[in-house]
C-alpha cells in the first residue's frame, strides 16, 4: 500500500476531524480520483504525435490512456466530429495514491521556476485542477526520447463539499501551495 494512503488514514483523518468537527469518519473528505488529460491539437495533421503523447501518458500513469475524440466539428480549428484530438487517464485506488505521492514529492518540485501552486484553482466543490507545461518533470519520461515537449492537465477530484475543505485536505498532504 502507498505510504501516502497510510498517512491519510493515520494522520490526515484525525487532523481534519478536529479541524472541521466532523461526527463520523465518513464525513472526512478524501481523494476520489486523479485525472490526467493531454490535449494534442496537432494530431489532426500527424497521427504519430497522438501515439507519442499516449506513450508518455502511459509511462507517467502506468495505465493505458483513453483516446479522446472531438465532440463536434469546428471549421476554424480544421477538426471534424470524431477526430482523435487527445488522450486521458483516470487513476483510482492504489495507482492514484502512488501517482499522488510521486506528484507531490518528485514531479512538482522539478517544475522550472517553481514558487508554489496557486490556491485559487479550486472549482467550488473542493476539486483541484492544475496545468503542467512540460511532461519531462516526471522521472518516468526519458528526456532524450521525447519528440516534443507537451503539457498536461491534472485534476484531483475529492469528496470535499467546499473549497475550504478541499484546500485543508491537500494542505494536510503537504501540497505545495503558494503562500
From Swiss-Prot:
<comment type="similarity">
    <text>Belongs to the universal ribosomal protein uL5 family.</text>
</comment>
<dbReference type="InterPro" id="IPR002132">
    <property type="entry name" value="Ribosomal_uL5"/>
</dbReference>
<dbReference type="Pfam" id="PF00673">
    <property type="entry name" value="Ribosomal_L5_C"/>
</dbReference>
<dbReference type="InterPro" id="IPR031309">
    <property type="entry name" value="Ribosomal_uL5_C"/>
</dbReference>
<keyword id="KW-0699">rRNA-binding</keyword>
<dbReference type="GO" id="GO:0005840">
    <property type="term" value="C:ribosome"/>
</dbReference>
<keyword id="KW-0694">RNA-binding</keyword>
<keyword id="KW-0820">tRNA-binding</keyword>
<dbReference type="InterPro" id="IPR022803">
    <property type="entry name" value="Ribosomal_uL5_dom_sf"/>
</dbReference>
<keyword id="KW-0689">Ribosomal protein</keyword>
<protein>
    <recommendedName>
        <fullName>Large ribosomal subunit protein uL5</fullName>
    </recommendedName>
</protein>
<comment type="function">
    <text>This is one of the proteins that bind and probably mediate the attachment of the 5S RNA into the large ribosomal subunit, where it forms part of the central protuberance. In the 70S ribosome it contacts protein S13 of the 30S subunit (bridge B1b), connecting the 2 subunits; this bridge is implicated in subunit movement. Contacts the P site tRNA; the 5S rRNA and some of its associated proteins might help stabilize positioning of ribosome-bound tRNAs.</text>
</comment>
<dbReference type="Pfam" id="PF00281">
    <property type="entry name" value="Ribosomal_L5"/>
</dbReference>
<dbReference type="InterPro" id="IPR020929">
    <property type="entry name" value="Ribosomal_uL5_CS"/>
</dbReference>
<dbReference type="InterPro" id="IPR031310">
    <property type="entry name" value="Ribosomal_uL5_N"/>
</dbReference>
<dbReference type="InterPro" id="IPR020930">
    <property type="entry name" value="Ribosomal_uL5_bac-type"/>
</dbReference>
<dbReference type="GO" id="GO:0019843">
    <property type="term" value="F:rRNA binding"/>
</dbReference>
<dbReference type="GO" id="GO:1990904">
    <property type="term" value="C:ribonucleoprotein complex"/>
</dbReference>
<dbReference type="GO" id="GO:0003735">
    <property type="term" value="F:structural constituent of ribosome"/>
</dbReference>
<dbReference type="GO" id="GO:0006412">
    <property type="term" value="P:translation"/>
</dbReference>
<dbReference type="GO" id="GO:0000049">
    <property type="term" value="F:tRNA binding"/>
</dbReference>
<keyword id="KW-0687">Ribonucleoprotein</keyword>
<comment type="subunit">
    <text>Part of the 50S ribosomal subunit; part of the 5S rRNA/L5/L18/L25 subcomplex. Contacts the 5S rRNA and the P site tRNA. Forms a bridge to the 30S subunit in the 70S ribosome.</text>
</comment>
Amino acid at each position: 500500500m502507498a505510504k501516502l494512503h497510510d498517512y491519510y488514514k493515520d494522520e490526515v483523518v484525525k487532523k481534519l476531524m478536529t479541524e472541521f468537527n466532523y461526527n463520523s469518519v465518513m464525513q472526512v473528505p478524501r481523494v476520489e480520483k486523479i485525472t490526467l488529460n493531454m490535449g494534442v491539437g496537432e494530431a489532426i495533421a500527424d497521427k504519430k504525435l497522438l501515439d507519442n503523447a499516449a506513450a508518455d501518458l502511459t509511462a507517467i500513469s502506468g495505465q493505458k490512456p483513453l483516446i479522446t475524440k472531438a465532440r463536434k466539428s469546428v471549421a476554424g480549428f480544421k477538426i471534424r466530429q470524431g477526430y482523435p484530438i487527445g488522450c486521458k487517464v483516470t487513476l483510482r485506488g492504489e495507482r492514484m495514491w502512488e501517482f499522488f505521492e510521486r506528484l507531490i514529492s518528485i514531479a512538482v518540485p522539478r517544475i522550472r521556476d517553481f514558487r508554489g501552486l496557486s490556491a485559487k484553482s479550486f472549482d467550488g466543490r473542493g476539486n483541484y485542477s492544475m496545468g503542467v507545461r512540460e511532461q519531462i518533470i516526471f522521472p518516468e519520461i526519458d528526456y532524450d526520447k521525447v519528440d516534443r515537449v507537451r503539457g498536461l492537465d491534472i485534476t484531483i477530484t475529492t469528496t470535499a463539499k467546499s473549497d475550504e475543505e478541499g484546500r485543508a485536505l491537500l494542505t494536510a498532504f503537504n501540497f505545495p501551495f503558494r503562500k
